[in-house]
C-alpha cells in the first residue's frame, strides 16, 4: 500500500512522470526536471554533488528506487539531446550494480536496460562502432537471460548501427544481406510477441 512517506512519494512522482511522457503530456526536458525532483527526495544534494556521484573513482550504494529513477533519467537525457550526461549516469549506476550493492531477481535485466541507454548515448554521439560492440554484448546476455524484449531491441539497434556505419564509410563494411536477415529476425520475433511498434519500425526500414 502506498502511503505518504518519502519513498512512496518518490515512486509516485517517477511513475506519474513516465506516464505523462509516454502519453505525450510532457516533453523530454520536463521529464528530466521531474525525475531529478523525484531523485532529490532522497539524494538531496544531487544538484551540488552530482559530479561526485558520477566520478570514476566513486561507487555509491544507491537504493533500488534511486537506480530506477537514474535509469529513466539516463534515457530522458538521451531523448532531450544530452547523451554525454546520459553516458555519465549510465556508467555511474552500472558501477553500483556491478559492485552488488543491490541484489534482486531483476538486477541483470536492469543492467541490460542501462547498457542499452549507454549504447543509445554512443549512437547520439556518432560513436557507432562503440554502440555496435555494446549492443552485441547486450544481445548475447539478453538471449541467455531469455529477456525477449531486449533481444528484439538490441537486434534492431544492431542493424541500425551497421547500416549507419556502411552509409558513413561509403562501403559495405557489414554485409547488406546479413543486415536484412537480422531485420527479418527482429520482424518475426516482434510479430510473435505482438509488438506492432517494433514490427512496423522494421518493416519501414526494410523497404529503404
Residue ranges, per PLM feature:
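Flexible inter-repeat linkers and adjacent short helices
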Residues: 1-30
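Structural signature of alpha-solenoid helical repeat junctions
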Residues: 4, 8, 58-65, 85, ...
Amino acid at each position: 500500500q502506498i502511503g505518504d512517506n518519502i519513498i512512496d512519494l518518490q515512486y509516485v512522482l517517477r511513475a506519474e512522470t513516465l506516464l505523462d511522457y509516454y502519453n505525450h503530456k510532457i516533453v523530454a526536458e520536463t521529464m528530466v526536471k521531474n525525475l531529478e525532483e523525484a531523485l532529490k527526495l532522497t539524494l538531496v544534494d544531487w544538484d551540488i554533488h552530482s559530479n561526485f556521484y558520477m566520478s570514476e573513482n566513486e561507487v555509491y550504494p544507491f537504493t533500488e528506487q534511486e537506480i530506477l529513477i537514474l535509469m529513466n533519467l539516463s534515457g530522458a537525457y538521451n531523448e532531450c539531446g544530452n547523451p554525454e550526461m546520459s553516458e555519465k549516469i549510465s556508467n555511474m549506476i552500472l558501477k553500483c550494480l556491478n559492485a552488488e550493492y543491490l541484489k534482486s531477481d531483476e538486477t541483470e535485466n536492469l543492467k541490460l536496460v542501462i547498457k542499452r541507454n549507454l549504447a543509445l548515448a554512443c549512437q547520439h554521439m556518432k560513436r557507432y562502432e562503440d554502440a555496435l560492440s555494446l549492443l552485441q554484448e547486450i544481445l548475447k546476455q539478453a538471449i541467455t537471460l531469455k529477456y525477449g524484449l531486449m533481444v528484439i531491441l538490441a537486434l534492431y539497434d544492431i542493424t541500425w548501427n551497421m547500416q549507419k556505419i556502411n552509409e558513413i564509410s561509403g562501403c559495405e563494411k557489414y554485409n547488406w544481406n546479413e543486415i536484412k536477415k537480422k531485420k527479418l529476425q527482429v520482424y518475426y520475433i516482434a510479430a510473435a510477441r505482438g509488438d506492432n511498434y517494433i514490427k512496423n519500425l522494421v518493416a519501414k526500414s526494410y523497404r529503404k
